Amino acid sequence: MNATDLLNHPYYDRFKDILSDPTNAWIERIQDAGKIEEGLVTMYNGLKVYKDCYYDNFSDIFWLNGGVHEPQEEFVFHHILRGIKNPMPTILELGSYWAFYSMAFMQKFPLGKAFCVESDPNFMAQGQRNFALNGFEADFTCGFVGNNGIKVDDFCAEKGIERLDILHSDIQSFELEMLYGAQKMISEERIDNIFISTHTQELHYACLKFICDNNYNLVVSIDMNESYCCDGIIVAQSRKVNHTPYNVARKGQRALWTDEQMIAHLEAKKNPLI
């Protein structure tokens, strides 16, 4: 990839947002983070993924940004993992696609359990491949989450899940329906940590109200105008958890990188695609 390729990349504007995020400087990366070898990319935490596993060439952000694709969310997720004391915790990832967050969870907790739900069978296959690549196991379900599909309360009952250490949801505008379908688990505080990607401002604040109305403590709320990752982000914790709010960087607090800075960053990389 040269400068012209970068400037004409279909995801260039997204890449500029991500690379401009000051949160990048706060994420600890292993030495080989972003390295491509034999069609695999090393993520910031050492996980391996297939280099085109996430929206094809959007995956270029993996090597451009040292194995990080959503700095704000990944930073908070990493610190939430560090706060989990249960040696055998459980994660439910809704909209799992390439299953990165579930893999990061299993990397931290080898005795844990991961349940992954994805509506697109082709996307789900990417997550299954990545899980197998890293030697992890998960319970994969292909299905739609929402009022007319899978409901968290019913899913947990069917799978025998008594409590969730993490509920992670990125389901493309069905997040409020997801919360309604998790009402029992949430009201009984059987979900310790909730991560929600939001896809409109209206949904963001509706989800935020639901979370607060159910007496969860807010860890971070980043609406779509403040996000470097395109989606809004809500992270909340049960009152049973030692609450730790995070003050992450927000878009608009500083200027985005210029084209010249983007090109300089590209040239500074040991570009694995040349």
Per-region residue spans from a language model:
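Short, conserved loop/helix-junction motifs that constitute active-site signature segments
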Residues: 108-109, 184-191
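Short acidic, Gly/Ser-rich segments with clustered Asp/Glu that frequently serve as metal-coordination loops
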Residues: 172-178
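A short acidic, amphipathic alpha-helical/loop segment
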Residues: 104, 154-155, 178-185, 206-210
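S-adenosyl-L-methionine
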Residues: 1-117, 120-161, 218, ...
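Conserved beta-strand signature within the Rossmann-like core of class I S-adenosyl-L-methionine
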Residues: 190-199
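Glycine-rich phosphate-binding loop signature in dinucleotide/nucleotide-binding domains
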Residues: 83-87, 156-164, 188
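Conserved S-adenosyl-L-methionine
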Residues: 95-98, 168-172
